[in-house]
């Protein structure tokens, strides 16, 4: 749709008059024309390139551009801005949530490391206490065993001394009897018991 300029309006009635002249055939004749005189197609330019319609074309271009600009400003741009704002807010919320989760994870890691260090220290302390207790118990057991062995050794030594004393006593008696028998065999008479005992005692001292 175009606005009609005055120049185009002046040309239009002339063209219409020529067309009407050809549009009324005589009675009984067959009309075979298309309503355009021969050679009229080459006279008029293509409407978009017609300089007489530039003003209306520019007017409609300005109107179309204005409508498009208003549509962009009032409808499309606000929607795009709202979408961008919504995405920006969502991204900001996601970043804040990620930061919060990271802080919680760092705190959990620090807590875990602290508890692990405390558990290690406690285990070392328990191990040291157990080793110390084991050393004390082993020392007490060693002393108890040594005391028991010492008592047993003393008892054994006393018994051995008693056995030795008894053995020496028996040996003295046997020696006296043997010496008396030997003297009797040698001299043919029995020696005095006191002399035999004195001789055996002197022999023990020499041994």
Swiss-Prot record:
Its main location: membrane. The chain crosses the membrane at residues 53-72. It is a single-pass membrane protein. GO terms for cellular component: plasma membrane; proton-transporting ATP synthase complex. Belongs to the ATPase B chain family. F(1)F(0) ATP synthase produces ATP from ADP in the presence of a proton or sodium gradient. F-type ATPases consist of two structural domains, F(1) containing the extramembraneous catalytic core and F(0) containing the membrane proton channel, linked together by a central stalk and a peripheral stalk. During catalysis, ATP synthesis in the catalytic domain of F(1) is coupled via a rotary mechanism of the central stalk subunits to proton translocation. PANTHER family: ATP SYNTHASE SUBUNIT B, ATP SYNTHASE SUBUNIT B', CHLOROPLASTIC. This is ATP synthase subunit b 2. It comes from Rhizobium etli (strain ATCC 51251 / DSM 11541 / JCM 21823 / NBRC 15573 / CFN 42). The gene is atpF2.
């Amino acid at each position: 749709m175009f606005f009609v300029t005055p120049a185009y309006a002046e040309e239009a009635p002339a063209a219409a008059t020529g067309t009407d002249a050809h549009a009324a055939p005589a009675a009984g004749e067959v009309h075979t024309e298309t309503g355009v005189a021969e050679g009229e197609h080459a006279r008029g330019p293509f409407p978009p390139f017609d300089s007489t319609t530039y003003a209306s074309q520019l007017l409609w271009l300005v109107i179309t551009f204005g409508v498009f600009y208003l549509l962009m400003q009032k409808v499309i741009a606000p929607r795009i801005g709202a979408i961008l704002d919504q995405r920006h807010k969502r991204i900001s919320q996601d970043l804040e949530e990620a930061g919060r989760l990271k802080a919680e994870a760092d705190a959990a890691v620090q807590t875990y490391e602290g508890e692990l260090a405390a558990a290690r220290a406690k285990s070392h302390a328990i191990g040291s206490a157990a080793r110390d207790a084991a050393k004390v118990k082993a020392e007490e057991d060693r002393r108890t065993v040594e005391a028991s062995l010492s008592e047993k050794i003393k008892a054994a030594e006393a018994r051995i001394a008693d056995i030795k004393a008894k053995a020496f006593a028996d040996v003295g008696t046997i020696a006296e009897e043997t010496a008396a028998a030997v003297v009797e065999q040698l001299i043919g008479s029995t020696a005095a018991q006191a002399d035999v005992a004195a001789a055996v005692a002197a022999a023990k001292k020499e041994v």
